[in-house]
Every structure is written in C-alpha cells, then in structure tokens.
C-alpha cells in the first residue's frame, strides 16, 4: 500500500514486518 511518501511507506511496511515476526516467534505453541 502507499502511506505518505516512499520513505514513510518503507518504514511502515518494515514496522508491520517486525510486528509480524514478533507475533510469529513469540506465540507459544499449543
């Protein structure tokens, strides 16, 4: 998606990736 200018878009997408990785790695196995 596009959010603000190119740099802002990259930062937002990177933040979503980091949040997704945290959720993936720190979700306990059930």
Swiss-Prot record:
Q: How does activity depend on temperature?
A: Thermostable, activity is retained after incubation at 100 degrees Celsius for 15 minutes.
For this record, the Gene Ontology CC terms, alphabetical, are: extracellular region
State where the protein is found: Secreted
Q: What is its main location?
A: secreted
Query: What is recorded on activity versus pH?
Result: Stable from pH 3.0-9.0, inactivated at pH 10.0.
Any Gene Ontology biological process: killing of cells of another organism
Keywords from the UniProt entry: Antibiotic, Antimicrobial, Bacteriocin, Secreted
So which domain of life are we looking at?
A: Bacteria
Relate the protein's function as given in its record.
Bacteriocin with antibacterial activity against C.jejuni.
| Other known facts | Antimicrobial activity is lost upon treatment with beta-chymotrypsin, proteinase K and papain, but not when treated with lysozyme or lipase.
> Could you say which protein family the record assigns here?
Belongs to the bacteriocin class IIA/YGNGV family.
Supply the name of the protein.
Bacteriocin SRCAM 37
- What organism is recorded for this protein? Paenibacillus polymyxa (Bacillus polymyxa)
């Amino acid at each position: 998606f596009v959010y603000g200018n190119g740099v802002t878009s990259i930062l937002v997408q990177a933040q979503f990736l980091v949040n997704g990785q945290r959720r993936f790695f720190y979700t306990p196995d059930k």
